[in-house]
Amino acid sequence: MAALTLTIAAFGQAQITTRKEKLSDFTTRTMKVVLSGNHFIDPIIREAVNNTWSLSAFEFCSLEDFNSLKNNEEYYFMLPVKVKYRAESKPGITMLTIVKGRASAKTVNDMVNVVSIPVAAADIPSGREAAMIPGLVDIMQGYIAKSLNGNFSGLRTYVTPLGKSSGRRVVIAKEDLSETVDSTFCRKMARKGLDIVDGEVADSLFLSGDSRTLVSYVVAPAEPEKGSVCWRILIDARTHELFYYRKRTLKKEDEAGFHKGDLKIIANTR
């Protein structure tokens, strides 16, 4: 899956994070949503923004429009950007990023990074993006709304502690498990209250906004390599609260996904 032709080394460390600047004009400005020409991700982003975004006015634009407008400080931009981490041989994941125009900017890296979140593999989709990206867009919106009146201090101030998820159902898609997690361990986790289901079931629960249910999502390269980065995420299907958001740099190709350690941490809060 191609996003933009832009490739970046480590934009904001590929986290939901911001520079410590007060962006108090966000709600009064228009956000340009960049559709890069990719026939897979563009419709998902368009639908997600249309159905979710209410914090500011927005308009859709092309990559060419972005290149001509990026130096205009009257605009914010939401755009998909491929990310290449230092140890990777090629970009592994796509981030959805919101930046502010800057007069001197030559590339995205030169612009004010408002918020960025991993949304998909860089090239080959997993098939779960259509279900999960609307929730990720809503997380970006909620984070900005919370941060408008003060300095941006990063995602860790926005993640809800897992301890507050007791009483909620936890659904882990089988596709989100690391290859190091075997069936015996899965059965053990099921006894501790984790529901491990097919990805289609997880997506259906998320799309229906199932009450008091956390659903997993993993963003990793389609073909991981040593040095690739994997993100493990748990989101409340109804409120889109973010309960788990962790980054792992892979030492082996089979490490992408939720590990036994992740599942133990989550199960201990049941």
How would you label these PLM feature ranges?
Residues A2-A3, I44-I45, M140:
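A generic short-segment signal for beta-strand/edge and adjacent turn/coil regions
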Residues L6-I8, A48, C186, I196:
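Homeobox/homeodomain signature
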